[in-house]
Amino acid sequence: DHRFRDLKTLAQQYPDKLQASVIQFYLFEADFSLMLAKKAISSGDRYYLSGHIFRMVSALNQVIFAKNKVYFLNEKKAIKRIDRFEFAPSKYEDRINEIFGSLYEEGGPTIGLLEVLLADVQNLISFY
C-alpha cells in the first residue's frame, strides 16, 4: 500500500523544527537539573542528588540524539549509542559512568564534571 510507504518515509525523516524544539527544551532541562544538583550536594541526600544527575544526563541524551537527527526511544543503551554518533562529546559513556560512580565515593560526585559535560554539549550544539 503506497499510503503506508509514504507515511513510513515521512516518519524516517527528523524534522528541523522538532530538532530545534527538543534541543532548546532539553538544554534548559539539563541546566536546571544541574542547578538543583548543586544545591543537593550540600544536603548529603544522595538519593535526591542522583535523581537530578539522572535527569540532567537524560536531558543531555535527548539533546545529542536530536543534534544527530535520531529519534530517542529510551535510556537503555543510549550512552553507548551516543559514542557512535557523528556529533557527540568525546568519551561520553566513560564520562557518564565516572559521574555516577562518584556518587559512592567520599565527597560525592564532582559538580565540575557535570558542568564541563554540559558545556561540551552546549558547544557541540553551537559549533555545528
Segments the model singles out, each with a brief description of its role:
Residues 1-41:
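Conserved NTP/Mg2+-binding pocket subregion across the NTase superfamily
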Residues 20-26, 75, 122-125:
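A nucleotide- and high-energy phosphate-metabolite-utilizing enzyme signature
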Residues 68-97:
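Short, charged amphipathic alpha-helical segments flanked by flexible coils
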Residues 37, 88-128:
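Terminal (often C-terminal) interaction modules
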Residues 36, 59-66, 70, 88, ...:
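Amphipathic alpha-helical interaction surfaces
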Residues 52-59, 64, 75-76, 80-81:
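Small-residue-rich helix-loop
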